[in-house]
A protein has these predicted regions:
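Short loop/turn motifs that connect adjacent beta-strands in outer-membrane beta-barrel proteins
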Residues: 10-19, 73-74, 133-137, 197-206, ...
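Surface-exposed extracellular loop regions of Gram-negative outer-membrane beta-barrel proteins
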Residues: 148, 243-254, 298, 333-378, ...
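Outer membrane beta-barrel strand-and-loop segments of large Gram-negative receptors
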Residues: 169, 181-185, 189-191, 237, ...
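Gram-negative outer-membrane beta-barrel transporters
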Residues: 397-401, 418-516
Length: 594
């Protein structure tokens, strides 16, 4: 459910407009998933093969607020607040083979994972624009954003097959885990805009100013390993409670012991930027934009993780000069061409540069403190054709050269894990994208002053070619880049019928993403591939009158399988590592407007 409202006032003798808007919503949904989890050695030998049933409850809340105030048509102040809260609670039971289980019974066993993820995002934005003179204005603003991520009391329990049923696995196989991630993100900006006279559309201007971003990430985790001293048989998995084994009485009698491990990392990122930019319309057809930006980047990471096995610090200090050029040529009222060239960079994320090892359901993952930022050189050419004001045909060709590309890789260590590496000195990306918005028909409705019967379609598709020579990869001669799907297609068909206060909108949305590399294989591992998926959604809204509306949403109607796979080195056979379906989600809603 959701609620929203707003109001506009006029303040003072100058009738300065003041407005506010508020909205808030709450959703809850439940999921049940059957999934397959496997893993192999580099040769293709399966050492983990488990079937799982996962039950999850997802709760989310959203709140938005906006306040705007205009003064004398010269000054503007606005404040935006956004709060997003998401809570997911899940329990997964997995049966099957795992090399951690006793080999006396073919490494068979049972794993239960209970997990809660509680995340909160709070965004505060204050934006101002001050008209200093008729030609000069000041843009200034600040935002303070907070991310709170909690994983309270995650529990992982492993039971190995035994003669009399099952027994609790010894070692570090019974865990309770608590973690917190706090991110504070402060952004500030101040810039002057001087409008130039071009005697055409009066869009020419010169801009220069400063922006700053200051981010602190603080992560803390506490892990408790419950080491079993005396093993008792559990006859059946159908009716057992771990509280019967892990309780105060058994702890006092040394039935089990508790080992506590603390992990912590801190990542500080400071970016100071100065920029200058000029836009000028030389003729009714030609518009040129030229810019130069200087960024001073300072990143520091301190860590003491993995039970003290990884302890240290590292810094990234970079100075970037980032030029950009954009040209627009208006051939006529319906056709235009754009050319853009720029240099940008990509910084590693906090989780990518901390060597903390996170234990996941499918894979463990660990950051790399020695990562370097990537440099990106971008070029794109775009043609836009507008047959009518509501229709569009657009074609874009693009090229990107990436130096020190950051990619996710698989490391063939004991147990194996996913990490991050500057996988190639340079990588290339090239492709084309097409976008079409077309009205199949637009007809007036008889006996209605305000009526319309409209059928329209939208199509967005792209082909992306990527290649890089990767010395660290198992296949060094050249490979696609991780995460880049060669083919992406989005299609929608929408029917809109309006008659007076009533309206009916029905939309069918089809999305396709082709196979892509999920993780690049190294040290003998082949690449992990993510299978392409085709999804279909249907959304319908019926506005019965100015106060009442009905909404129907049917998501994931095709319910495709999401699969990860990897080929074995010895025979090239494809092994499915993960296989699950998200399920079909159907919801019906009622909206009331006052």
């Amino acid at each position: 459910y959701s609620i929203s409202g707003g109001k506009r006032f006029y303040v003072g003798k100058d009738k300065n407009p003041f407005s506010f808007f508020l909205t808030a919503g709450h959703t809850t949904d439940y999921q049940y998933t059957d999934e397959i989890i496997r893993n192999t050695t580099t040769s293709g030998t399966v050492y983990k093969d488990m079937n799982g049933k996962k039950y999850a409850e997802n709760i989310s809340q959203l709140a938005l607020a906006n306040v705007d105030f205009d003064m004398q048509n010269r000054h503007h102040i606005s404040y935006n607040l956004m709060m997003i809260h998401a809570n997911t609670q899940s329990v997964g039971d997995y049966n099957g083979k795992n090399s951690i289980f006793s080999d006396d019974y073919e490494n068979l066993g049972f794993t239960r994972r209970q997990q809660t993820n509680d995340n909160m995002l709070i965004v505060n934005q204050l934006m101002t624009n001050w008209g200093l003179t008729k030609s000069l204005s000041l843009d200034a603003g600040a935002s303070y954003n907070m991310v709170k991520g909690y994983e309270p009391d995650r529990r992982i329990n492993n039971l190995t097959k035994a003669e009399d049923g099952y027994t609790l696995l010894r070692g570090n196989s019974q865990q309770r885990y608590f973690s917190t991630l706090d991110e504070d993100d402060l952004n500030v900006k101040a810039g002057l805009v001087y409008r130039l006279k071009d005697n055409i559309e009066e869009i020419s201007n010169v801009r220069f100013g400063y922006t700053g971003r200051f981010v602190d990430d603080n992560f803390k985790a506490t892990e408790y390993n419950l080491t079993v001293g005396h093993v008792s048989a559990i006859p059946s998995l159908d009716d057992f409670s771990l509280d019967d084994y892990y309780n105060q009485e058994n702890f006092a009698s040394d039935w089990f012991k508790i080992q506590k491990n603390l992990d912590e990392y801190i990542v500080k990122k400071n970016i100071h930027s100065a920029y200058a930019e000029a836009t000028y319309q030389f003729t009714p057809r030609w518009i040129v934009n030229l810019g130069l930006k200087y960024d001073k980047v300072d990143i520091e990471v301190d860590y003491n993780v993995n039970r003290g096995g990884s302890k240290g610090n590292n810094t990234i200090q970079k100075d970037y000069f980032l030029p950009s050029l954009n040209l627009k040529y208006n051939l006529n009222d319906k056709n235009s061409f754009r050319l853009g060239a720029s240099k940008t960079y990509t910084l590693p994320q906090a989780k990518e540069i901390s060597p903390y090892r996170y234990v996941g359901v499918n894979f463990n993952s660990q950051g790399n403190p020695n990562l370097k930022p990537s440099d990106n050189y971008n070029l794109d050419l775009k043609w836009d054709f507008n047959p009518t004001p509501t229709e569009l045909i657009s074609l874009t060709a693009f090229y990107k050269l990436i130096k020190n590309r950051i990619s996710r890789i698989e490391v063939a260590s004991a147990g194996g894990y996913l990490s991050y590496e500057n996988i190639a000195d340079k990588a290339t990306v090239a492709g084309v994208e097409i976008e079409i918005r077309k009205n199949l028909f637009v007809r007036p409705v008889s006996n209605a002053a305000h009526g319309m019967n409209k059928l329209s379609l939208g199509l967005n598709g792209s082909y992306i070619y990527t290649n890089a020579k990767m010395p660290l990869a198992t296949v060094t001669t050249g490979s696609q880049l991780e995460g880049a799907a060669p083919w992406i297609v989005n299609f929608d068909l929408s029917h809109n019928f309006t008659k007076g206060e009533r309206s009916f909108v029905n939309t069918l949305v089809l999305n396709y993403v082709s196979d892509k590399i999920y993780t690049i294989g190294t040290q003998g591992y082949q690449d992990i591939m993510e299978q392409g998926v085709l999804t279909l959604d249907f959304v319908s809204q019926a506005k019965l009158n100015k106060h009442l509306s009905l909404n129907l949403k049917a998501r994931n109607l095709l319910n495709p399988s999401y699969k990860l796979s990897r080929k074995a080195n010895e025979n090239g056979e494809k092994v499915i590592l993960n296989d699950y379906k998200k399920g079909i989600n159907i919801s019906l809603g009622v909206s009331c407007t006052f």
